[in-house]
Amino acid sequence: VLKYDGLAAGKGVVSAETMDEAREALRDMLLDGRFGKGRVVVEDFLTGPEFSLMCFVEGENVYPMPVAQDHKRAYDGDKGPNTGGMGAYTSLPFITDEDLEFAMEKVMRPTAKAMVAEGCPLTGVLYGGLMKTPDGVKVIEFNARFGDPETEVVLPLIDSDIANVF
């Protein structure tokens, strides 16, 4: 998996299936400067469904929102290039209470705590792009913002006035 290390409007990830696809993606990102000047991160290819866990964070205090899943691919059947998000849904049947507890206790809360320890505390939204693999929940990405389009299906489920959160 090749990821452009910078802003790419949700389109900077290529899951290359062949070396030719990988070379083409690297050429596009680095030599042709598709997203500007930057670097590329090479990651292991993981299998399993992706999901998004957004949390309200104030320092080490982390409050989860409902999990959601977006549809990234341009074509039906999860085919084609990644987009910035074609739609989303929530109430994910494949996520167990244990998965959510792991994501909170081993990913989201430790991340917020580490940000405080590094002198960069977050007050806002921490977005965890996660994947449920055969080996458990893994981190795909983090953002310090609401997920798009996931926010469209998550915010209506929050009972309180969101203005009170901030």
Which residues make up each language-model segment?
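Conserved, structured core segments of small domains
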Residues: D148, P156-S160, V165
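Short glycine-enriched loop/turn motifs at secondary-structure junctions
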Residues: G6-G10
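Internal nucleotide-binding/catalytic subdomain
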Residues: G12-V153
